[in-house]
Amino acid sequence: CDWSSDVCSSDLILLLNATQITEEPEEGKPSTFGQCLALLGKPFILLSFLGIMCHVGIDVGTNTTAPKILMERLGMTLADAGFATSLYFIFRTAGCFLGAFILQKMAAKTFFAISVLCMLAAMFGLFVFQDQAMIYVCIALIGFGNSNVFPIIFSQAMLYMPDKKNEVSGLMIMGLFGGTIFPLAMGVASDAVGQSGAVAVMLVGVLYLMFYTWRIKK
């Protein structure tokens, strides 16, 4: 699917721009799949892995759900409602760009909390708003809020186990693809109660990220 490659590409580009990397000579053998999965036994690494899954779930979910919300509540055509996806990526891209500068001046934990609060407010807004402009504001907030979640979680995981950089990075990348399970749950929820059900699934992901905020080091 095109969206999966877009999600991975944008996150990896953001990571490379936002993270300072000191190259060191490679030592030992390349990490195996089993060695990466074994790190899930470490509580913080598991929390980080789940956090990245939530990030991807929110990202993919917003792209698929936002246009449907406009169509369901405002009777817009698919062509017109498709602007919601573009709006999301505009603010996500802007957030990626600004985040690289903000993280130089602000603690990662503080910025992560602000980002999650933006998404939390937006999710509640998507439950209640029927106005086109306000729905667009919510979509923009999700785009900005979700733009720096991946690099912050990734860096926190790397700092937690600096001696296992290869394994940790491999596991976090796996989380990008693991997050694709969210659309399945969202599809079931939307079939049952409409697009508000899909928003509820994304809200669970945002609430988890709120919980993860307290585990981030300053």
Residue ranges and their predicted role:
Residues 38-86, 93-96:
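Extracytoplasmic gate region of multi-pass secondary transporters
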Residues 147-162:
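Intracellular juxtamembrane helix-capping segments at the cytosolic ends
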Residues 1-3, 7-9:
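Short, small-residue-biased leader/transition segments that mark boundaries at the very start
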Residues 110-125:
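Structural signature of the two symmetry-related core transmembrane helices
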Residues 12-18, 203-218:
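Multi-pass alpha-helical transporter architecture, strongest
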Residues 160-195:
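A late C-terminal transmembrane helix in Major Facilitator Superfamily
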Residues 22-48:
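Juxtamembrane intracellular "pre-TM" segments in multi-pass secondary transporters
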Residues 95-108, 190-191:
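Helix-to-loop junctions at the C-terminal end of transmembrane segments
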